[in-house]
Regions:
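Generic long, charged, amphipathic alpha-helical segments
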Residues: 14, 18-54
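Short, well-ordered loop/turn elements at secondary-structure boundaries
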Residues: 1-4, 25-26, 53-55, 83
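Glycine- and acidic
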Residues: 2-4, 30-33, 56-61
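Residue-level signal for secondary-structure boundary elements
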Residues: 25, 57, 121-125
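Active-site proximal loops enriched in glycine and acidic residues that flank catalytic Cys/His/Asp
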Residues: 9-11, 33-36, 41, 61-65, ...
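Active-site phosphate/pyrophosphate-binding segments
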Residues: 1-9, 13
């Protein structure tokens, strides 16, 4: 299958992405886990992503808010290695790493997974 959407992620969100992708008919998303941030193995990363370098969309997906987690460390490396800045799929910037509400957490989690898989429904209300 041809990859149109390359998703880079780390940790538990990988399993959420896999589960959601299984429910999408004819998904053109490839998911790659990045688990070693430092020292970052640029040669290994290049080897793993090379077959997907021409994907229309490259995404970094994380559960943490925009201003937390691995994004701020990794996006300059990804930009250098991929020649473009990946799209960020995750929670908006916030002072707290958690919502404090399980219901809201589940809603946000489903939204960031759908966003990463390019399955968001745009509302025009």
């Amino acid at each position: 299958k041809k990859t149109e959407n390359l998703i880079l992620c780390s940790g538990k969100v990988y399993y959420d992405l896999l589960e959601a992708r299984e429910g999408i008919r004819n998904s053109k998303s490839t998911i790659i886990r990045v688990e070693q941030f430092y020292p970052f193995d640029k040669a290994k990363f290049q080897e793993v992503v090379a077959p997907y370098a021409k994907a229309k969309r490259i995404v970094w997906c994380q559960e943490e808010p925009y201003n937390m987690g691995a994004w701020n460390f990794l996006f300059p490396i990804f930009e250098e290695m991929l020649g473009r800045r990946p799209y960020f799929a995750g929670r908006t910037a916030t002072a707290s790493p958690a919502t404090g509400s399980l219901t809201l957490h589940k809603i946000e989690q489903a939204a960031l997974v759908a966003d990463a898989l390019d399955q968001t429904q745009t509302s025009h209300t």
